[in-house]
Amino acid sequence: MMHSLLLLAALTGPGQANGLTLTDARLTYGLLGPKRDSAKFLPGDTVFLAYAIDGATAGPDGKVQYTIALEVAGPGGKSIFRQPPQDEEVVNSLGGNRLPGYARVQIGLEQAPGEYTLKVTVTDRASKKTASLEQKVEVLPKAFGLVQLTLSADPQGKVPAGALGVGQSLYVNSHVVGFQRGPAGQPNVALELRVLDEGGKPTLASPLTGRIDKGVPPKDPVLPGEFLVSLNRPGKFTVELKATDEVANKSVTQSFPITVHETK
């Protein structure tokens, strides 16, 4: 079942407010990652939901105190996961009246297919005002595919990349699920990464490549993969990641946009 919930909130600066609202809800590829257009997920994937908290109350010392709760309802509307409200406290260092919020829900490898609803509820502990938002997602049947696609600033995948600038190193992290194994008990999965410029032209004549075909324990259902992309010039690009199961003769592709800013 769904598990491993993480709720985070980082401050861009709330101020005195007349009301509390949750706005700009969007699915993303990982924490601080680019927007994800599809709300369809394979078992083993992770749902990242980003949103903005507007109108929280800041004290004289800039502290903002609030609670966040999350509930997941499965097909038919029955609640299958609930995390009670958790107290959060941040400091209004930059002023303003907005806090970015994030929710993460891990989808189990055996999660039943169907439509699920995530409900986030935020309460301003000073004003006692409450606001909620809902996000529907669809869990697909098990299949070969790429899951847990995230962007990080470190090879361990622990530091979200966030805004991108010239000179940075970008790590594209993903996992492969639903693969088959050959006669020797090993998978044979080829990975490719291409970067396309704003006009859709590949930035390199050949894609970055990798292969997973040995050393995989017999019971491992997930294959991790990673590519390093050096951000040497500004612009808008599309990153295209492809996985091919050469045992089953199946391929899947995921793509997402990135914008690299000039650092001055």
Question: What do the PLM-derived regions correspond to, one by one?
Answer:
Residues 2-12:
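Sec-dependent N-terminal signal peptides
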Residues 15-264:
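Intrinsically disordered, low-complexity terminal regions enriched in Ser/Thr/Pro/Gly
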